[in-house]
Amino acid sequence: MSNPFNISVLSGSKSASAKLDIARSALSGIKGGFSTAVMRALNRASQSGRTNAVKAIRNEYTVKAGPLRKSFAIKKATRKNLETSLGAKGSRLPLSDYRFTPKQDTTGNKRKPVRAAILNQGLRPVGSAFVWKGMILQREGTRSTPLIKPLGPAVPFLANRDEVIDVVQSGMGETFLRRLDHEVGQILKTGLKGRNGGKIHG
């Protein structure tokens, strides 16, 4: 298990305090308006953070987007708890979640050698590995030894790099500020409405 990766939307945002004061003042006449606007903006920011994290990691590593995205979890904000964060944790991923060739099953003594790449660089041979049903498998020893799945890095390891953290943190902050303006405008225009068009009370 790798150390968890976790980023809060407002940590490090110098512009947030002033924006929040403006939003609070603008929505002071609408009960629940301020908390609703902030909640929606926070949750949109954390969603964009996950998207940015996946893109930033895939700029450097060949890991598939699906397994990568599933390793991130968003703690959603509510009107009573105006906090949200983006986290990632998990064990090492199978090497088959990274780029490899060939894609078809390989069997027999004359099978094609398996090659894989973790970084966005050239493919390299993976010992005596073979491909079966889309998975890379390998034996450590004779045919009587159990099959193992060669592993690549875990997502927290991929995410806990300064360049990824900086991109995600700044992007989340920018999205929050932009969405806060939008949400305040929407509430001033239409009042408090749920996503299904119903009124929100509180």
Spans of features found by a protein language model:
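Short, Lys/Arg-rich flexible segments
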Residues: 1-202
